[in-house]
Amino acid sequence: MATDELATKLSRRLQMEGEGGGETPEQPGLNGAAAAAAGAPDEAAEALGSADCELSAKLLRRADLNQGIGEPQSPSRRVFNPYTEFKEFSRKQIKDMEKMFKQYDAGRDGFIDLMELKLMMEKLGAPQTHLGLKNMIKEVDEDFDSKLSFREFLLIFRKAAAGELQEDSGLCVLARLSEIDVSSEGVKGAKSFFEAKVQAINVSSRFEEEIKAEQEERKKQAEEMKQRKAAFKELQSTFK
């Protein structure tokens, strides 16, 4: 494999440099300035050696992973920036989601496990069965560790916003119930939310009424046109 060969070459090169003590043979024909530059490579050599070591370590780790040695880094352990990865949400929305995540992360380990999710759903007023909780985690569990990282928690709201969750699924219920955080929004926030819902329903009803009125008007016009045609034909027949 090319990766193994490159890693071997880098390791051998580092070993040879270590045995040689970093000495460089004097090259004939160099003038004074060039000789001075060639004789003072300490910082550059140190930086190059550090970069070589880092690259060698990465290549060796990749070779180990390809051979089934070592464990790959799980997505939940990777550092990510929620503001750049989840651009569809505002900073305030992400902050609210983070606050909710930390509220139910009782173990303070950066994850919401099965029992913590069970407690969350009970406090939201939508208790789930053991199997239901497992299915909730499974739907966004990218690294298959049977618990939710903050990134996976954000995926719930991304899927909900995109309409990718079934209406009766536990994750959809979680996203819907967490729209109103009574502890921060208070009764006023809940009131304004439901008023907005009622207003949206009223607007929808008015829209439906307008459509029905237009349909009735078209029917009336069609009936009048039909009657005029019949009258015209009757008038024509009298002149034959």
Swiss-Prot record:
Found in lymphocytes; preferentially expressed in CD8+ cells. InterPro entries: AIF-1_EF_pair (IPR049025), EF-hand-dom_pair (IPR011992), EF_hand_dom (IPR002048), EFHD1/2 (IPR040365). The keyword Calcium applies. One of its GO terms (molecular function) is calcium ion binding. GO terms for cellular component: membrane raft. Its main location: membrane. The modification Phosphotyrosine is found at residue 83. It holds the Pfam family AIF-1. Residues 92-127, 128-163 form the EF-hand domain. SUPFAM superfamilies: EF-hand. Ca(2+) 1 binds at residues 105, 109, 116. Ca(2+) 2 binds at residues 141, 143, 145, 147, 152. The modification N6-acetyllysine is found at residue 233. It comes from the Eukaryota. The modification N-acetylalanine is found at residue 2. Residues 13-38 are annotated as: Disordered. PROSITE patterns: EF_HAND_2. The modification Phosphoserine is found at residues 11, 74, 76. Keywords: Acetylation, Calcium, Membrane, Metal-binding, Phosphoprotein, Repeat. It is found in: Membrane raft. May regulate B-cell receptor (BCR)-induced immature and primary B-cell apoptosis. Plays a role as negative regulator of the canonical NF-kappa-B-activating branch. Controls spontaneous apoptosis through the regulation of BCL2L1 abundance. Interacts with CASP9; with inactive form. This is EF-hand domain-containing protein D2. The gene is EFHD2.
